[in-house]
Amino acid sequence: MLKLIDMMHIAIFTALMAVLGFMPPLFLSFTPVPITLQTLGVMLAGSILRPKSAFLSQLVFLLLVAFGAPLLPGGRGGFGVFFGPSAGFLIAYPLASWLISLAANRLRKVTVLRLFFTHIVFGIIFIYLLGIPVQAFIMHIDLSQAAFMSLAYVPGDLIKAAVSAFLAIKITQALSLSDTMFTKGG
C-alpha cells in the first residue's frame, strides 16, 4: 500500500509530465515523432522517486492521456496516440523511469556523471529499444530506417539526460527527502 507521501510524489511527477507536455513540440520533416521535453520528466522521476513511485507517476500520466487529457505536446491525447508512431516511446516511459530508479538506488555514490550514464542507458537506449520497433511497424518501414530517423533525437536526448542528472542531484539535495534515491530500498 502506498503512503500519502508516495501518492503526493506520484502526483507531482505526473503533473510535471503534464507541464512538459505543454511545451511546443518540434516536428522534423522526415518523421511524425516530435521532439519533446517529456523524457526529461521520465528521467527526473526515475532519479528522484522510489522505483514503484517512479513507475506509477508515468503510468498515471499515460492513463490520463489515454482517457483523453491533451497532455502530450501539441495538445494530443486520447487512446489513439497508443496506435501512432510514438506509441512504443510512450509505453516505455513507466518502465524506463522504474529502471532508472532501480539503477540509481544501486549506485554506491550518486554523482551527476553516474546518473547521466544511467539516463543514457535507461532513459534513452531503453526507450529507443521499445520505441523504434513500434514506430517501424506502425509506419510500415524497415527497422533500420526507423533507427536512422531516430538518430536526429540523440543530441537533444543527451542534453536532457545531462540536465536531468544535474537537476535530480540538486533537487534531492535541496529537499533532503528521506525517501529518495539516496535512501536504499523501496
Swiss-Prot record:
The chain crosses the membrane at residues 10-30, 54-74, 80-100, 119-139, 149-169. Keywords: Cell membrane, Membrane, Transmembrane, Transmembrane helix, Transport. One of its GO terms (cellular component) is plasma membrane. Its main location: membrane. It is found in: Cell membrane. GO terms for molecular function: biotin transmembrane transporter activity. Induction: Repressed by presence of biotin, under control of BirA. Probably part of the bioY-yhfST operon. Disulfide bonds: none annotated. It holds the Pfam family BioY. The keyword Transmembrane applies. Probable biotin transporter. Belongs to the BioY family. This is Probable biotin transporter BioY. It comes from Bacillus subtilis (strain 168). The lineage of its organism: Bacteria, Bacillati, Bacillota, Bacilli, Bacillales. The gene is bioY.
